Amino acid sequence: MIVGLIGVVEKISALETHIEVQGVVYGVQVSMRTAALLQAGQKARLKILQVIKEDAHLLYGFLEEGEKILFERLLKINGVGGRIALAILSSFSPNEFENIIATKEVKRLQQVPGIGKKLADKIMVDLIGFFIQDETKPMHNEVFLALESLGFKSAEINKVLKTLKPSLSIEAAIKEALQQLRS
């Protein structure tokens, strides 16, 4: 699995960026924001998400870990694929997007190409608990992702997250949340 690339940027286009790494040129899909920060002929270090489908092997590149985490979370939403997730990251920084979700600005989300009212509403509902605005944020995000990977719904997880003590370790919080969800 490819998780990162360090090489020289050969070509930057709206569809794909080419990076040469020790004689091999990789086609990497990046957001417009990332593309704007890259320069042809310059060395770049990208965090990579490799997506293997029936008909394609895709590489998505990110300069920041926060962008990659948000992209991965967006892909988990039914109806959001790589194209729409990149369009969101091209339109908003992760912090801007977090504020849009926190303030429930559906109209701003609908300005992204490919996102209509129905999908914007779905994204809002699915991500409302992903961004927690307090000191327990790192713990809540880890617990949220762990519970989601076990098949629990966002609404159920958000309800339980509100009851967890901030002093719990991530492991203890997951155990406590599982007990509450299974009761």
From Swiss-Prot:
<dbReference type="GO" id="GO:0005737">
    <property type="term" value="C:cytoplasm"/>
</dbReference>
<dbReference type="GO" id="GO:0000400">
    <property type="term" value="F:four-way junction DNA binding"/>
</dbReference>
<protein>
    <recommendedName>
        <fullName>Holliday junction branch migration complex subunit RuvA</fullName>
    </recommendedName>
</protein>
<dbReference type="InterPro" id="IPR012340">
    <property type="entry name" value="NA-bd_OB-fold"/>
</dbReference>
<dbReference type="InterPro" id="IPR036267">
    <property type="entry name" value="RuvA_C_sf"/>
</dbReference>
<keyword id="KW-0238">DNA-binding</keyword>
<feature type="region of interest" description="Domain I">
    <location>
        <begin position="1"/>
        <end position="63"/>
    </location>
</feature>
<keyword id="KW-0234">DNA repair</keyword>
<dbReference type="Pfam" id="PF01330">
    <property type="entry name" value="RuvA_N"/>
</dbReference>
<keyword id="KW-0963">Cytoplasm</keyword>
<dbReference type="InterPro" id="IPR000085">
    <property type="entry name" value="RuvA"/>
</dbReference>
<comment type="function">
    <text>The RuvA-RuvB-RuvC complex processes Holliday junction (HJ) DNA during genetic recombination and DNA repair, while the RuvA-RuvB complex plays an important role in the rescue of blocked DNA replication forks via replication fork reversal (RFR). RuvA specifically binds to HJ cruciform DNA, conferring on it an open structure. The RuvB hexamer acts as an ATP-dependent pump, pulling dsDNA into and through the RuvAB complex. HJ branch migration allows RuvC to scan DNA until it finds its consensus sequence, where it cleaves and resolves the cruciform DNA.</text>
</comment>
<keyword id="KW-0233">DNA recombination</keyword>
<dbReference type="GO" id="GO:0006310">
    <property type="term" value="P:DNA recombination"/>
</dbReference>
<dbReference type="InterPro" id="IPR013849">
    <property type="entry name" value="DNA_helicase_Holl-junc_RuvA_I"/>
</dbReference>
<dbReference type="Pfam" id="PF07499">
    <property type="entry name" value="RuvA_C"/>
</dbReference>
<feature type="region of interest" description="Domain II">
    <location>
        <begin position="64"/>
        <end position="141"/>
    </location>
</feature>
<keyword id="KW-0227">DNA damage</keyword>
<dbReference type="InterPro" id="IPR011114">
    <property type="entry name" value="RuvA_C"/>
</dbReference>
<feature type="region of interest" description="Flexible linker">
    <location>
        <position position="141"/>
    </location>
</feature>
<comment type="subunit">
    <text>Homotetramer. Forms an RuvA(8)-RuvB(12)-Holliday junction (HJ) complex. HJ DNA is sandwiched between 2 RuvA tetramers; dsDNA enters through RuvA and exits via RuvB. An RuvB hexamer assembles on each DNA strand where it exits the tetramer. Each RuvB hexamer is contacted by two RuvA subunits (via domain III) on 2 adjacent RuvB subunits; this complex drives branch migration. In the full resolvosome a probable DNA-RuvA(4)-RuvB(12)-RuvC(2) complex forms which resolves the HJ.</text>
</comment>
<comment type="similarity">
    <text>Belongs to the RuvA family.</text>
</comment>
<dbReference type="InterPro" id="IPR010994">
    <property type="entry name" value="RuvA_2-like"/>
</dbReference>
<feature type="region of interest" description="Domain III">
    <location>
        <begin position="141"/>
        <end position="183"/>
    </location>
</feature>
<dbReference type="GO" id="GO:0009379">
    <property type="term" value="C:Holliday junction helicase complex"/>
</dbReference>
<dbReference type="GO" id="GO:0006281">
    <property type="term" value="P:DNA repair"/>
</dbReference>
<dbReference type="GO" id="GO:0005524">
    <property type="term" value="F:ATP binding"/>
</dbReference>
<dbReference type="GO" id="GO:0009378">
    <property type="term" value="F:four-way junction helicase activity"/>
</dbReference>
<dbReference type="Pfam" id="PF14520">
    <property type="entry name" value="HHH_5"/>
</dbReference>
<dbReference type="GO" id="GO:0048476">
    <property type="term" value="C:Holliday junction resolvase complex"/>
</dbReference>
<dbReference type="InterPro" id="IPR003583">
    <property type="entry name" value="Hlx-hairpin-Hlx_DNA-bd_motif"/>
</dbReference>
